[in-house]
Amino acid sequence: MKKISKKHPVRKIAAGAAILAIAGASMPAAALAETNEVRFAQQFGLLYLPMHVVVDKKMVQACASKAGLGDIKVTMHRFSGGAAVNQALLSGNVDFAAGGIGPLLKLWDKTKGRLNVRAMTTLSAMPLKLNTNDKRVKKLEDYVGLTDHKIATPSVKVSIQAVVLQMAAKKKWGAKDAFKLDPMTVSMKHPTATAALLAGGQSVKSHFATLPTSFQELTSGKAHNVLTSYDVLGGRHSTVAMYNKEKWKKSNPKLYKCVYTSYQDSIKWINANKKDAATLYKRFTKSKLKLADIEKMVGNPDEMLYSLTPEGTMKFAKFMHSIGSIKNLPASWKDYYWENNHDENGG
């Protein structure tokens, strides 16, 4: 008797599913949906002007539209210091954090092998200035023994200013005393610290400042400079970088490229249009400073440099590793910067 073959619908469904799975696996990553929002974290001052340009000129949105990503929402969130910025990135409240080289290295070290935070790009360089209204203080050693004097930094122990102060202490008194002045430091927003210095009569008598607050302090006649970060490191160094988590980068390759390209374009625009950039800063931040003063700051590369190239960052990494602030010693700056930066002649 002839054997009658039976149909197997279950097998057909399974085969179809397998074909779909193979097809899905072969789809390029760019074909998969990317996020429709980019959230930036920033802090205070002229160091963050490239972000203001990117947001004001809608550079990310324009690039995303050309890349076929549709409408992208771009938001900017302000924080008082590197510790708060890092926490916002870790908690998923922002996608990109703009912070000092110190906070970048702390987060790179903390997330290495897990979340893998690295820098998307460098934004800017400036000499951080330790200013004081205390006439007793002319040099670093004059701080020793003062019981009525506090030094304001954006984040105690974490901010780039806090790290530079430790570097200065090590340079002056040796490795065992790198933390000698840490008990004098307090966390404070730049505008609040400047207000304290200019008002006088408060416990905060020194401020490790950035532009424009350092300019306000020194031109007021009420404060003088003790040292700069360029003095401590022996030359210019990058100050602020933009960093993010590996997962966001891998999940949004086209949008990541748009963000990076936007910052490239913003820095090119600033350097080619410094007066217009100063005007944008004043309008965007609602600054009460005179436009002519902002133009002076933006126009002087010795005081305010906008550059994608990492400079002097390994000096921070080696120092922070030597005092135990980070556990992992990077072999080079490329360890904590994403590969899109690796063609830069960095350091």
Task: Tell me the role of every PLM-derived stretch.
Residues 2-17:
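Bacterial N-terminal signal peptides that target proteins for export
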Residues 8-9, 22-31:
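C-terminal segment of classical bacterial N-terminal signal peptides
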Residues 34-187, 201, 205-211, 235-236:
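Short, glycine-/small- and polar/acidic-enriched structural segments
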Residues 49, 53, 83, 87, ...:
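Solvent-exposed, polar/charged alpha-helical surfaces in well-ordered, non-transmembrane soluble domains
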Residues 79-83, 98, 155-163, 191, ...:
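Soluble non-cytosolic domains of exported or imported proteins
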Residues 191-283:
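Pocket-lining segment of extracytoplasmic ligand-binding domains
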Residues 249-327:
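Secondary-structure end/capping motifs
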Residues 318-347:
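Conserved C-terminal helix/tail region of periplasmic/extracytoplasmic solute-binding proteins
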